[in-house]
Amino acid sequence: EAPEAMAVDAPRAEREPKRARTDVHAVAPAAQAVQVPPRPKDAGWEDLDKDDVDDPLMVAEYVEDIFAYMRKIELQCMPNGNYMSMQRDLNWNLRGVLADWLIETHAKFRLLPETLFLALNVVDRFLSLRTISLSKLQLVGVTALFIAAKYEEVLCPSIQNFLYVADGGYTSEEILRAERYMLKVLNFDLSYASPMNFLRRISKADNYDIQTRTVAKYFMEISLVDHRLLDHPPSLVAAAAVWLAREVLERGEWTPTLVHYSTYAEDELLSLIHISEP
């Protein structure tokens, strides 16, 4: 048979050029590069700051930067959540007793909520850095409240008032000496962003509901007694308190606007909400 005939009758696979195979592994990175980005957790939120542009007291132009700064410094002012392991004479129950006493004393003096939160923060940060004896625990507490009142209040109670609530257990010289020492240990850093700061921001997305705000403040206050919350930033405590208050009062779902102004989605709050469960 002629060679020409054999060429004509050659199989189709031999007559057509082979197609290059696609390398799946080579394409994968490119496919990943064009993936649709995840949906923001606050997608669909409403801008409530735009209504305050003409109000200089609301500083709408700077409010985002202000709270971004607060979220930064709140991490710098958090105590060691396990500081009791370095204390020889103290335990968490004694810390709870001190917190109860400070809450009661704070109420007697009718001080601002910020004063109470700062006082407990000073106590916990100081005890994270120094070991003390049981006999000095109340001195640390009363001095911390004295420091916080000076920092937050317009009219700070006199040192004689603090001597009275301490039942004469310390002299004014001891409190003043403790004040100097504690501030030195803390490097004079009292720039604490308390849950109250973040509660005000979140309340904006809650239409400043007075009932929700009041119940949330109650939850925030009792959180001071529970040492298990020391590892959680104040912004998270505030958001969880508002979420729980809204649940109790049946105020509806955790909206994208609440997510935006609190910076926490609902699933980020649940671990803190259920922290007291067995």
Regions found by a protein language model. Name each.
Residues 1-142, 146-276:
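Acidic, serine/threonine-rich low-complexity regulatory regions at protein termini
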